Amino acid sequence: MIIGIMGAMPDEVDQLCARLENVTVELYGGVEYHRGTLAGKQVVVCCAGMGKANAAATTQVLITRYGAEKIIFSGIAGNMTSKIGIGDVVIGKTVLYHDAQLDMICQNPPYLKEYAGDPALITAAEKACAEAGVKALTGKIATGDLFVGDSETKAAIEAKCAPDCVEMEGAAVSQIAAKNDVPCVILRAMSDNADEDGHEVLVVKKFSIAEYVATATRIVAAMVEAL
């Protein structure tokens, strides 16, 4: 079994890449694919780049070129719910686009308006979070091609689809995985509250996301070990 592990930014995958053994690296389509073993399992780790197009293209490459049989996307997101806080995790039970006309998208394979996380991968993620002492919520993730960093945009997304967090890649990864019948799950550690404070910290001041990424890295490593 080959497990594909993705992130959108280098910081989101660097810690995982550092854990790999027997590593080979291939540059393909502008993306570095790190093949190796993690907890004795064959994995391919890559930084897809930000946004839906990058995420979709890289997911297909992982499946077609590298034979990924399961996909785990790990990274950070903006919190949209009072049920959790900064540093906590959302596990994607459902993932959808907040910036697309869903009744148009669902006219093509896989004919879905939203995408379900794989039950076995969700269970593995829930167990890994519990064992790591990380508070996790299995819920809804919304994806769009913008960084949500103001209250007005946040409120509009809340009114449209009421997600638990918002990010820029998950639905695209999930759509391509579903199209290929490959099990997939999206994991997100909360780095901000998708408001003005988040924009100031992450965009203006370029604050380090290492502590949030470390949470996601621990969870993914534990999941791979359990699979």
Task: For the regions a language model picked out, list residue spans one by one.
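Short, conserved "active-site rim" segments that organize catalytic pockets and cofactor/ligand binding
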Residues: 1-20, 42
